[in-house]
Amino acid sequence: MKKIITIAAILVLIGTACRREADYMPYIGENGKLAYSTYTEQFDYLWKVLSTGYVFWDVDTTDWDAAYSRYYPKLQELDKKYEQIGYVPTDELKELYTALVGGMIDHHMSFSVRNLHPAPDDQVNYVTIRPYELEIPTRDYYFESSGEESYAIQIFLQDIESHYTVEVHEECTDYAPELGMTIRYHYILFKLPDGRKVPYLWQSLAGITPVMLQNGVGAQLLDHYFRAIMETPREQLAGIILDNRCNRGGYQDDLDYLIGSYLNEKTEIMKTRYKEGPGRYEYSVWTPYYIFPNTRYHRDITAENIPYVVLCDLNSVSMGEIEPMTIKAVLPTAHTIGERTHGGTGPLQPANCIDLNYGGPLGDINTGHYVYTSTFEAQISGKVWEGIGYTPDEIVLRKDYNGNLLPQLDAAFRYIQEH
């Protein structure tokens, strides 16, 4: 993952008399080493953690000071309950923390708290709140699939020859050690009725960069996809399709291939910033993030007016949605189709990098808490899209077709043939 460097800082410190001040913390990495013995101490500490380390305070509408005033007394009641009966049901703790953080906009966030004194019949002794699990089902185009989404699209692609003429269809699974996950790939070279070709790529995660470095089966498949784009004569190349439906995210370096392969010069694609200090609004400056022309693959699809269609849906998350957003923002022939995406656009760093700044994942559930939250705030096309997601150029909803994946792909081919 690329390192992002800033050269200046913006400092804004805000305090109020309606709640206890967030104590200065030397760096947020220390937060994982603190201890507490009561529910109020636990709450007080976690409130300070998010006051310091949450990166979206400039756009999140949660009134964090009012939340302290409202919920601190409720945690005092839990302490009294423990003193009276010797335990606190985990469901009661979950209800309070869901009300506290459930409406936050960070769609990467996972907020876990251990119940210090669970009831004897509690099945678990901790609660986990993920704001996106509460927000996503409220969208009017939400479609509840009967199975895991990435499997659904793989089954669909395995039967693609029954819908379209296919000249090449390669699929494989490769392991990306940097992600600690396996990635499933499908490369298809479609043939249109007029004989022209459309290279297509679907991957379950954004892992082109680490897989290319390994030079295994995944790298071979990816090379075939990019070679088809680079080497097919213009009169035979109808367009390009990148399918990011059900793509759960991964490496931002993949943009070096997915955008850089089509650039002639260094290009800014977004800006990022992070929490530089303990103050709630103590950010670094917005730092441009540039993509350079790819030295391995290159074709000027803008000059040749080659359509570049990117499919995305509600299950396009993190890099899975940043890719269609930035491709559309940078490349004039790009066109996006599908659904408004998940809304988790804040880049992340591993927990072992947390001491480099004041935001991101921290803690250990075995010692009381674990908070997984975005390290960086991203601004694309002048806007922070966290908790909102990206709305594509052309809306085609799976819900309108009982979950069928084909109409979105049909729309991609229709656009390519019309342009």
Language-model features and meaning:
Residues 205-209, 246-252, 268-269, 276-278, ...:
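Solvent-exposed loop/turn segments at secondary-structure junctions
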Residues 17-270, 355-357:
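Flexible, low-complexity junctional segments that flank or bridge functional domains
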Residues 199-203, 239-243, 269-271, 307-312, ...:
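Structural recognition of the beta-strand scaffold that forms the well-ordered cores
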Residues 249-307, 349, 355, 368, ...:
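Gly/Ser/Thr-rich loop/hinge elements
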Residues 1-25:
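Bacterial Sec-dependent N-terminal signal peptides
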Residues 320-332:
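Non-catalytic, well-ordered alpha-helical segments in soluble enzyme domains
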Residues 331-344:
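Short, well-structured beta-strand/strand-turn elements
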